[in-house]
From Swiss-Prot:
Residue ranges with Basic and acidic residues bias: 86-108
Organism: Chlamydia pneumoniae
Stretch list, region Disordered: 74-162
Protein name: Uncharacterized protein CPn_0483/CP_0271/CPj0483/CpB0503
Reported effect, Y482H: In strain: CWL029 and TW-183
Bias type Pro residues, positions: 109-132, 144-154
Domain spans labelled OTU: 255-349
SUPFAM superfamilies per record: Cysteine proteinases (SSF54001)
Length: 1043
């Protein structure tokens, strides 16, 4: 029996159980059919796992395309769905007169196709051209005969001529918000984040309208609730959170938010969105609103102010006409508001319009001088670097060189500021015998008379100081006897300088002399005793110089000596600017590492370092400082120990010491030992390190030693910068550096320059050939190209003849052009360029570059201009012919040259920002705003119209006056809402003024009167679109599909 059963089981095997045990699915496939090969069982298991993976992937793909599908970047948009036309039967019924007792309203369409809101049904007999055509009745069917009595007219709304079947504005707005809430596919310009890259979308123009509570980045409603309900927080914080919450809820109930890019044009972008939206909403009541707005634009005074503005208004009117042709608000939004081209037109129009309105307001309420001051005040915040770039690109170089580099005009000063300026440069008011002998006998007498008047004026001021309590006895007892030896030594050197410059016996008191010393070396004022004394005398001197009196009246200078007084004020200001600019360069971060890209910096640093070392060694090798041999060494060693105790400071200090300009060699003729020479070299290197890395002033391990060393060494540097004998040398050093700042190479080159980059360089080089000296390989290639190709016999012969006429006719421009070349190109007489750069070029190439810089000379109707024009056309043709050879020569080494040019551009930008920074006397006692004041003084020489043009070009974003100016423009009225949580604009003092208006400003337009609604976030604007109450309930809850 058992054998029969075994035979039966082998013939008919019992199948395995259909359901595996729980949690044993894979184990089931491995254990079932154990007689199968192991490989087969493993493949069966793998197939089972892959089946699960494929199934899960299909489910995820279906979910993605249902809820998270992304719109394509390219392709045609989905055409709008037009509403169905009325049925023929409905038209026949509409023609019949209503019977008594019946409602005279037309029949309502079926619920399946609701009519657009706020849009009347189309007229029965005159459907507009763009609406769907009504099907024709069969030819054999006769029309319904008219009734005997004429029926009363059926009231129907007049259709819009250009948008006959347009969908309602509120219906479209609701649909757009629903798309955002459902995460439906949106146009690419409406998405802030690129759906493919997952990064910021560079094509973003404006978002679709969204609910306020769906914008947590701007309205942190949950955070507001949490703070408002937290009893542990201060009352003012909870109140601010509660007010911010109430404002957010109010805005959420009444508005949708449209966000725009924060590129500086956010105000104009938001205004454009609100403007077009308001016009489209009004078009449901006024069919020709866009045409009326276009006509209003063309009638603005702005349209007739200039041809450019007239063209801009005409372009804007065409855009408004285009807006009137769209069939729905969504089409308008996608076609115009989300268009990069149309948005650029809107921004340009609104920017120019607001700028014109500002100018009209200033012209109507201010004179020319006040208008200039207003424009310049708008530039002084952060726009001065951009203003300088604009001037360098658009103004003649001769003007900039004369006003910013060669000679800085004395700015407007009050009488007391001029008096302090004279005291700061007191030794220079008295000439030496050698300087006096260079003058004519008559001028010598006038100069001596002027110096007598100056001595008498300061003697009178000394008596006033003594009468105020600071006589010689008190000064000696309180101040002089308690001065440190280092300050007393520097004060003695200051007095000796005055006596050596023909001042004779000082007729003024020691108190006034020491006050002038503190003005010359302001870092000494950081000594507590000196600071107290300076403040006491400063109040006395200010009281002696009332603002209503001129400096001539205060000092009682005669009219015969007035010219010398003005000369001294001007020369004192020049030295002030020189010392300020040099100190700014020395304190520019990493200026020592920029020496390789700007050779003039290395020369300046080396000259200053040698000057400082010589002054220090001379002072400490002669009495009275020679009597304290350990004074300097103790301070130097103390600071070196502190620096080497921190690895970070040690690395920075080693970088400073490795600069080529600070590798000071020992002068064998100085008589200094190696230990003394090393000490003075280390002192110079430490001072440069302090100036380059100001953080050591506050570090606990270095601040005490730094303070003492600066107190000891900085006065030497400050006094050297203002010494008359050093003025010309320092000015020569500065002219080369400041002159190079006007040279702005093209934009940053890539690491692998293309042929287009090479052509850009060639074009720039034809105007600024001095740029080639930045890189030795580039300079070599360019000079080889010039020697081999450009000197043409005919051109060179003509150039030699033209050079003499150009020099005599356009002397100023020609000299400035050569000066610019040689300032930047000569590298201050370094061995690599012993001769001037202009002498290394052929005459034909030199005149070719000169005319590229001054193309207006070719437009004059003179015989010389005709010859220059013919020469320039021939030279340009020659340069274009041989340019390929230059491009070929740039094939090798150009990437390295562009890296050097990029490094120079970075150094240039850094220096410009520091030179134009608004600073006062800092912790080191230097005022670094000389170049800034020179630029502002030059701007005051321009007209208000020129300043307005500059401001319009460099302004990066809409300022408060731009927003206020738009209220005077006869367009749609707009309101601005400030969010309560912005602490920069809404303070605790004025927050009550915004509570009643929910943050809206009454100073612009009240909320109830506005058609355009803007909201201001911290440094950003957005647009608010009013919600339709009939669709409010529909969007009050987020869609269930929204995750």
């Amino acid at each position: 029996m058992i054998k029969k059963r075994a035979i039966f089981e082998r013939m008919f095997p019992i199948p395995p159980p259909h359901c595996p045990p729980n949690n044993k699915n894979n184990f089931y496939h491995l254990t079932t059919d154990t007689k199968d090969p192991l490989l087969l069982r493993i493949l069966r298991t793998i197939g089972y796992v892959l089946l699960h993976i494929i199934t899960l992937g299909l489910l995820l793909l279906i979910h993605y395309y249902k809820h998270h599908r992304v719109v394509r970047k390219e392709g045609l948009p989905t055409p709008p769905t037009l509403p169905k036309g009325p049925e023929p039967k409905t038209i026949e019924i509409a023609k019949q007169p209503p019977k008594d007792g019946e409602d005279k309203k037309p029949d309502v369409p079926k619920p399946g196709t609701p009519p657009p809101e706020d849009t009347p049904p189309p007229p029965p007999k005159a459907p507009s051209p763009a609406s769907p055509k009504v099907p024709k009745q069969p030819a054999d069917k006769k029309p319904t005969p008219p009734p005997e009595a004429p029926p009363p007219p059926v009231r129907v709304a007049t259709p819009m001529p250009l948008r006959p079947s347009s969908q309602g504005y509120w219906q479209c707005l609701n649909r757009m918000v629903s798309m955002v809430l459902r995460r439906a596919p949106l146009p690419l310009p409406a998405m802030q984040v690129d759906p493919i890259l997952g990064d910021f979308n560079p094509h973003f123009v404006a978002s679709y309208p969204n609910r306020i509570d769906n914008e947590p980045m701007y309205f942190q409603i949950k955070q507001f609730k949490k703070i408002a309900q937290n009893p542990d927080l201060p009352q003012q914080h909870r109140r601010l959170a509660q007010l911010s919450l109430e404002q957010a809820l109010y805005l959420n109930d009444n508005y949708y938010l449209v966000n725009v890019p924060g590129d500086g044009n956010c105000f104009y972008r938001a205004y454009a969105v609100g403007w077009l939206s308001a016009l489209y909403e009004e078009s449901s009541r006024n069919d020709i609103v866009f045409e009326q707005e276009a006509t209003r634009l063309l009638d603005l005074p702005f349209a007739s102010s200039s041809p450019a503005n007239a063209n801009l208004c005409a372009e804007m009117a065409e855009l408004l006409q285009l807006c009137s042709t769209y069939c729905s608000f969504i089409d308008l939004y996608d076609g115009v508001i989300l268009s990069q081209k149309h948005t650029a037109t809107l921004i340009a129009f609104l920017r120019k319009l607001s700028a014109y309105a500002i100018r009209q307001q200033i012209a109507a309420s201010s004179n020319e001088e006040t208008a200039r001051a207003l424009f310049i005040s708008d530039m002084q915040d952060d726009l001065l670097p951009s203003v300088l770039e604009f001037l360098a690109a658009n103004r003649p170089y001769s003007e900039l060189f004369q006003n910013l580099i060669d000679h800085s005009a004395l700015p407007y000063m009050q009488s007391r500021d001029k008096l302090f300026l004279l005291l700061e440069h007191l030794p220079a008011l008295f000439l030496t015998d050698a300087e006096l002998q260079k003058m004519s006998p008559e001028d010598q007498q006038l100069r001596k008379q002027y110096e007598r008047e100056i001595r008498e004026a300061f003697a009178k001021l000394s008596r006033r100081i003594a009468d105020s309590g600071w006589d010689t006895e008190r000064f000696n007892a309180i101040v002089k006897d308690y001065l440190p030896e280092a300050i007393r030594c520097q004060y003695s050197r200051f007095l000796a300088t005055i006596e050596n410059r023909r001042s004779g016996d000082l007729p003024w008191s020691p108190a006034l002399s020491f006050f002038a010393f503190l003005c010359t070396c302001p870092s000494v004022r950081f000594h507590k005793l000196c600071a107290t004394f300076y403040k006491s005398l400063e109040d006395i001197i200010i009281a002696s110089a009332p603002p209503q009196r001129s400096i001539q009246e205060i000092l009682q200078i005669s009219n015969a000596s007035l010219s010398y007084l003005n000369e001294d004020l001007d020369s004192s200001w020049q030295r002030e600017v020189i010392s300020s600019n040099i100190m700014t360069i020395l304190t520019t971060h990493e200026s020592l590492t920029l020496e390789s890209s700007m050779p003039q910096l290395e020369t300046l640093h080396k000259r200053i370092a040698n000057l400082l070392k010589n002054v220090i060694s001379t002072s400490f090798e002669t009495p009275p400082l020679s009597n304290q041999p350990d004074l300097l060494s103790n301070l130097v060693n103390k600071l070196l120990v502190a620096i080497h105790s921190k690895l970070e400071l040690k690395e920075h200090f080693n970088t400073v010491c490795s600069a080529r300009s600070l590798r000071l060699t020992r002068d064998e003729g100085s008589g200094l030992s190696q230990e003394q020479d090393l000490l003075y070299t280390q002192a110079v290197q430490l001072l440069f390190f302090i100036l380059q890395h100001p953080q050591v002033n506050n570090r606990p391990e270095t601040k005490d030693a730094v303070k003492e060393l600066k107190m000891l060494l900085l006065p030497f540097l400050q006094y050297a910068f203002k010494k008359v004998e050093n003025e010309k040398k320092l000015q020569k050093l500065l002219r080369s550096i400041l002159g190079s700042l006007v040279l702005k190479p093209p934009a940053r080159y890539p690491s692998t320059p293309s042929n287009k980059d090479k052509e850009t360089f060639c074009k720039f080089w034809s105007r600024h050939p001095e740029v080639m000296v930045l890189d030795p390989i580039l300079e070599k290639n360019c000079m080889q190209f010039l020697r081999a190709t450009f000197p043409n016999y005919q051109l060179e012969t003509e150039a030699i003849l033209l050079e003499k006429e150009i020099e005599s006719t356009f002397r100023n421009g020609w000299n400035v052009f050569l000066t610019r070349l040689n300032l930047f190109g000569s590298k201050l007489g370094s061995p690599s360029s012993p001769t001037a750069l202009s002498d290394q070029f052929s005459k034909s190439f030199l005149i070719f570059c000169f005319l590229n810089n001054y193309p207006k000379l070719l437009q004059k109707k003179t015989p010389l201009a005709a010859r220059l024009d013919a020469f320039q056309r021939e030279a340009s043709h020659r340069f274009t012919q041989v340019k390929d050879k230059l491009l070929l020569s740039l094939k090798y080494g150009f990437p390295l040259a562009t890296a050097t040019i990029n490094q120079y551009s970075r150094a240039r930008d850094q220096l410009i920002c520091n030179l134009l920074k608004n600073t006062v006397t800092a912790s080191d006692g230097f005022c670094r705003s000389g170049f800034r004041q020179s630029l502002i003084g030059y701007l005051h020489s321009l007209s208000s119209n020129e300043l307005g043009d500059i401001l319009d070009d460099v302004k990066e974003q809409a300022e408060a006056n731009d927003v206020a100016a738009m209220t005077t423009v006869p367009l749609q009225p707009f309101a601005v809402c400030l969010i309560m949580s912005d602490r920069d604009t809404v303070s605790e003092e004025n927050i009550e003024n915004f509570v009643a208006m929910h943050g809206f400003l009454n100073t612009i337009s009240p909320e109830r009167d506005a058609r355009i609604f803007l909201i201001r976030f911290p440094n950003h604007y957005g647009c608010l679109l009013p919600r339709n109450p009939r669709t409010e309930d529909q969007n009050s809850k987020p869609d269930s599909s929204n995750p």
